[in-house]
Structure formats: C-alpha cells, structure tokens
Design a protein with these regions (language model features):
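Phosphate-/nucleic-acid-contacting segments
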Residues: 197
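Generic N-terminal amphipathic, Lys/Arg-enriched alpha-helix
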Residues: 1-13
Length: 221
C-alpha cells in the first residue's frame, strides 16, 4: 500500500509511514481487500494525492468516508465516475455552485477535473468495506489523514480548506488559520441542507476570491 503513495507526497509523509500505526493499517487494509469486497479499487486508494501533486495544491475539500456502494468510490471525496447518478450531497454541492457562480449544473459527477486544478478531495478514511459505511474507521486512516493535513498546513501557505459538517470542522485544529483560509459550514447532505445549513454559503466564490488575491489561478468549478 505504501508503494501507492505518489512520489510528490513522499517527502512529507515518509516519517508517518514508518510508524507502527501505519504498518498495522497496511496489514488491516491488505487483509480486508483479500477477504471482502472493498472500495475504492486498491490502485485508487491514494487518488486524491495522485491527481493533485503537492506543488500544485491550492484547495483541500475534506470528506469522511468513501462511498460504500458498487461503482461509486474512486478515491476522491464526493466524486463519482462519469455516467453514475449523482449522490444527494454532490447534487447539493453542484446546486450551490450554480447559484454562487451562475454556472450550469454539470452533467458528470466526476471531480477529477477539480483535482487536476489543485484541489485535494480527501476523505478522512480512505477505504471502506462494501455496503458497510464506516467499517474502516478507527484503524489508522484518521491518524494518517490528520498528519497529512497538519503537514500540508506547515509546508504550504495561502491554501483554502473547505470543512463541511461537524466532523470536518474538527479538523481545523490541524490547520494554521493565520496562513490559510478556512471556510467551514454545514454539510451538503439533504439532512443539513434542508435545515438551512448549506445553501447560500458562497464558499466557491469566496475560495476563488482568496486564490486571486494571493496570485493563484481561480478554480473552474
């Protein structure tokens, strides 16, 4: 599994991947993929890093868990492959972008186009057993991704962190808010959005405004 971590990220992750917890995590994930159907495909476990090299990173969007249904998870938070029905949270993300930026609702839910512009679409837990949400939580992934967020905060400047929902907001403790922009709010899930905690946050225009002020190319959402 360690071999799947892209070269551009190895420099800031080499210390944590040598720790006992990561060795235990590797053994757990290897066993799970051998004995059960798991998502995403093993080759896509670190897709969030592979599609967004460290030197191109501008934005971090944090999710919690990969999709646990067949054909959905591809290693990027909130993203689904082309021609796959958009999950409810992704629909609400696109609706907010529509309103915030006056752009058309996209046909595809594949967010690799965002990743290639410098957005890391990171789930706190990078794997899951099929049809069992949260089944790979508390096995070491959270330690790995918390460390990753902390290292990114130290290494980089003027990034935008989009933290949606209570779980994601707790990750702000790993981010230096004096050198990065943290945009936090309700989760885009229908439960949260229908209570008024999602729509109207204007996170996407605020993100672009911050990037522009800091001399970075805006995201084509």
């Amino acid at each position: 599994m360690q071999k799947l971590i892209p070269n551009s990220w190895e420099t800031i992750l080499k210390d944590t991947t040598k720790l006992p917890y990561f060795k235990a995590l590797k053994a757990f994930v290897s066993s799970e993929y051998k004995e059960h159907s798991c998502f995403p495909k093993q080759a896509d476990i670190f897709a969030a890093l592979a599609l967004c090299p460290l030197d191109q990173l501008k934005v971090v969007i944090l999710g919690q868990d990969p999709y646990h249904g067949p054909g959905q998870a591809e290693g990027l938070s909130f993203s689904v492959p082309n021609d796959i029905k958009h999950p409810p949270s992704l629909i609400n993300i696109f609706k907010e972008i529509e309103t915030d930026l006056s752009v058309s609702y996209p046909k595809s839910g594949n967010l690799s186009r965002w990743a290639k512009q410098g957005i890391m679409l990171l789930n706190a837990t990078l794997t899951v057993r099929a049809h069992e949400p949260g089944s790979h939580q508390k096995q070491g992934w959270e330690t790995f991704t918390d460390t990753l967020i902390h290292k990114i905060s130290l290494e980089k400047s003027n990034l935008v962190f989009l933290l949606w929902g209570g779980f994601a907001k707790k990750k702000s403790k790993h981010i230096d808010s004096s050198k990065h922009l943290i945009l936090s709010g309700g989760h885009p899930s229908p439960l949260s959005a229908n209570r008024g905690y999602w729509f109207g946050n204007e996170h996407f225009s605020k993100c672009n405004a911050y990037l522009k002020i800091n001399g970075k190319t805006e995201i084509e959402w």
